[in-house]
């Protein structure tokens, strides 16, 4: 697919959040991707696509092959450390994400789905729960942070209050201490009030790597 473009969105006074955006006139949905680790999408490579190694970023071209707007969320310019879970549930981060959602909605009427992986699942969940304007149509969490020792871990948030379609995707042999598969099953049980919801375990693949 043709590459997207980098944009800067003003989210707070004196602060902006860069995004890498692929816009399509035939988009059926807008996918807002929250990467793991400290967030962001890395540098732009020679092919004009983000070169970050995170799962959601390195698969960006695959998303763009389908009729979706694809938004990869960068790091705010004031240097908030998004490797810390507490910063991903803080009002400042949520304010940034709310401004981002408004900017996306102004650009396209397509339903907005938030997708997070690893630490990005904290951001995606918190932003969905903070949405009081029905901007978010659905939520996808991959390799969810479920360890209670992590501030903002998904099961520590009020996920039973979610009222949007929610999909949990997890590798059956995820070896990360923060993403243990058996704890994801417990997480899914807290989504009983969320209609529809689904837990999908996958197996196989290449050599494991951290995201």
Regions found by a protein language model. Name each.
Residues 55, 82-107:
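Alpha/beta-hydrolase active-site loop
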Residues 1-26:
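N-terminal cap/lid segment of alpha/beta-hydrolase-fold proteins
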Residues 60-80:
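Conserved alpha/beta-hydrolase
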Residues 24-62, 66:
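Short, surface-exposed "cap/lid" segments of acyl-processing enzymes
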Residues 138, 143-204:
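The feature captures the conserved acid-bearing segment of alpha/beta-hydrolase catalytic domains
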Residues 205-211:
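Catalytic histidine-centered segment of alpha/beta-hydrolase-like enzymes
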Residues 102-161:
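Primarily recognizes the serine-hydrolase "nucleophile elbow" in alpha/beta-hydrolase
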């Amino acid at each position: 697919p043709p590459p997207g473009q980098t944009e800067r969105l003003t989210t707070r006074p004196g602060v902006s959040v860069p995004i890498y955006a692929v816009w399509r006139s035939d988009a059926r949905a807008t996918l807002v991707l929250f990467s793991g680790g400290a967030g962001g999408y890395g540098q732009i490579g020679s092919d004009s696509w983000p070169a970050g190694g995170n799962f959601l970023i390195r698969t960006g071209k695959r998303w763009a092959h389908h009729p979706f707007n694809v938004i990869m969320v960068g790091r705010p310019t004031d240097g908030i450390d998004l490797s810390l879970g507490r910063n991903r549930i803080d009002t400042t981060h949520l304010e940034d994400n709310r401004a981002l959602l408004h900017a996306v909605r102004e650009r396209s009427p397509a339903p907005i789905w938030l997708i997070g992986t690893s630490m990005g699942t904290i951001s995606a969940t918190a932003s969905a729960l903070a949405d009081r304007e029905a901007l978010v149509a659905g939520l996808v969490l991959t390799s969810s942070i479920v360890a209670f020792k992590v501030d903002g871990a998904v099961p520590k948030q009020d996920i039973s209050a979610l009222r949007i379609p929610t999909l949990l995707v997890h590798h059956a042999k995820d070896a990360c201490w923060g993403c243990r598969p058996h704890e994801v099953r417990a997480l899914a049980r807290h989504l009983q009030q969320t209609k529809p919801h689904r837990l999908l375990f996958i197996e196989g693949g290449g050599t494991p790597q951290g995201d």
